[in-house]
């Protein structure tokens, strides 16, 4: 009787560990950076994505042209982009 309770406890702990690990790996950011966005918006568009994991292939979830969308990233900021601005994060 004691060994069956131990087995149930171990299986339960294993399942909890797997579920927790799945949640952690869901927010992995893809390499490279979002393209520079110098567009001034009066109103933001509804987001087409929330994280890089929402985008297929190499595409990243970037704020570009008034809304979050999946775009092909660039290796570095384009000429004329604000080098000090973190364009991969939403504006405050």
From Swiss-Prot:
Disulfide bonds join 34-62, 41-66, 49-61, 55-70. SMART domains: WAP. One of its GO terms (molecular function) is serine-type endopeptidase inhibitor activity. GO terms for cellular component: extracellular region. It comes from the Eukaryota. It is found in: Secreted. Residues 27-74 form the WAP domain. Residues 1-23 form the signal peptide. InterPro entries: Elafin-like_sf, WAP_dom. Keywords: Antibiotic, Antimicrobial, Disulfide bond, Protease inhibitor, Secreted, Serine protease inhibitor, Signal. It holds the Pfam family WAP. GO terms for biological process: defense response to bacterium. Antibacterial protein. Putative acid-stable proteinase inhibitor. This is WAP four-disulfide core domain protein 12. The gene is WFDC12.
């Amino acid at each position: 009787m004691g060994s069956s309770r131990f087995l149930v406890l171990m299986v339960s702990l294993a399942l909890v560990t797997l579920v927790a690990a799945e949640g952690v790996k869901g927010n992995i950011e893809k390499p490279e950076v979002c393209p520079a966005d110098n567009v001034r918006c009066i109103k933001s568009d509804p987001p087409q994505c929330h994280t890089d994991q929402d985008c297929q292939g190499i595409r990243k979830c970037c704020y570009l042209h008034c809304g979050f969308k999946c775009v092909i990233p660039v290796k570095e900021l384009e000429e004329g982009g604000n080098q000090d601005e973190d364009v991969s994060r939403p504006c405050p």
